[in-house]
Structures are given as C-alpha cells and as structure tokens.
Amino acid sequence: MPKAAAPAKRATRTKRAKKDPNAPKRGLSAYMFFANEQRENVREENPGISFGQVGKLLGERWKALNEKQRAPYEAKAAADKKRYEDEKQAYNADQEEEESS
C-alpha cells in the first residue's frame, strides 16, 4: 500500500514595505502613453469589447507602428522618465534630511 503524501506546506507571503503615498510616481513607458491616447478610439471602434480584448488590440496596434510613428511616444516617455528621476532625487534628499533630524 502506498504511503500517504506529506501534507503540503503553505507558502508564506513576504510582507512588502508600505508605499509612501508622497513618493513620486514612476515614469510611464512609451507604450503606456500610446495606450492611454488610443484606448477610447479602440472602445469606440469595437463597442462591447472586453478589457482584455482592448489590451490585445492596443498591443497589436503598438507592434504595427514604425519608428517614426513611435517617436512622439518615445519622446514623452523620455521626458516623463526625466521628471521621475528629478522628483525622486528631491524626494530622497527630503527623506535623508528627515532621518538625520
């Protein structure tokens, strides 16, 4: 007669540190700028479409763009990345200042 399998151990979740609500928001990617701009167009062209299908269509449209068509979104993403880095640097300086006080 086969032995009973040992009871499976439950995986314990590691606790994440709470996010500071005052921390700067991460910069958006070029795709996210594109998706935010095109989402309503996709919904209007395909009424009744599910959330997942909207994402698939947006992904297909993004992949179909050439470098020239992606350039404005890449520029927005670069500017947003710079904004995030500047805000994060200022935020970290404030945090260090508070810790030393």
From Swiss-Prot:
<feature type="region of interest" description="Disordered">
    <location>
        <begin position="69"/>
        <end position="101"/>
    </location>
</feature>
<dbReference type="GO" id="GO:0005634">
    <property type="term" value="C:nucleus"/>
</dbReference>
<keyword id="KW-0805">Transcription regulation</keyword>
<comment type="subunit">
    <text>Weakly associates with the stable SPT16-POB3 heterodimer to form the FACT complex.</text>
</comment>
<feature type="region of interest" description="Disordered">
    <location>
        <begin position="1"/>
        <end position="27"/>
    </location>
</feature>
<comment type="similarity">
    <text>Belongs to the NHP6 family.</text>
</comment>
<dbReference type="GO" id="GO:0005694">
    <property type="term" value="C:chromosome"/>
</dbReference>
<comment type="function">
    <text>DNA-binding protein that induces severe bending of DNA. Required for DNA-binding by the FACT complex, a general chromatin factor that acts to reorganize nucleosomes. The FACT complex is involved in multiple processes that require DNA as a template such as mRNA elongation, DNA replication and DNA repair. Also augments the fidelity of transcription by RNA polymerase III independently of any role in the FACT complex.</text>
</comment>
<dbReference type="Pfam" id="PF00505">
    <property type="entry name" value="HMG_box"/>
</dbReference>
<keyword id="KW-0238">DNA-binding</keyword>
<feature type="DNA-binding region" description="HMG box">
    <location>
        <begin position="24"/>
        <end position="92"/>
    </location>
</feature>
<keyword id="KW-0804">Transcription</keyword>
<keyword id="KW-0158">Chromosome</keyword>
<keyword id="KW-0539">Nucleus</keyword>
<dbReference type="GO" id="GO:0006281">
    <property type="term" value="P:DNA repair"/>
</dbReference>
<dbReference type="InterPro" id="IPR050342">
    <property type="entry name" value="HMGB"/>
</dbReference>
<dbReference type="InterPro" id="IPR036910">
    <property type="entry name" value="HMG_box_dom_sf"/>
</dbReference>
<keyword id="KW-0234">DNA repair</keyword>
<dbReference type="InterPro" id="IPR009071">
    <property type="entry name" value="HMG_box_dom"/>
</dbReference>
<feature type="compositionally biased region" description="Basic and acidic residues">
    <location>
        <begin position="69"/>
        <end position="89"/>
    </location>
</feature>
<protein>
    <recommendedName>
        <fullName>Non-histone chromosomal protein 6</fullName>
    </recommendedName>
</protein>
<keyword id="KW-0227">DNA damage</keyword>
<dbReference type="GO" id="GO:0003677">
    <property type="term" value="F:DNA binding"/>
</dbReference>
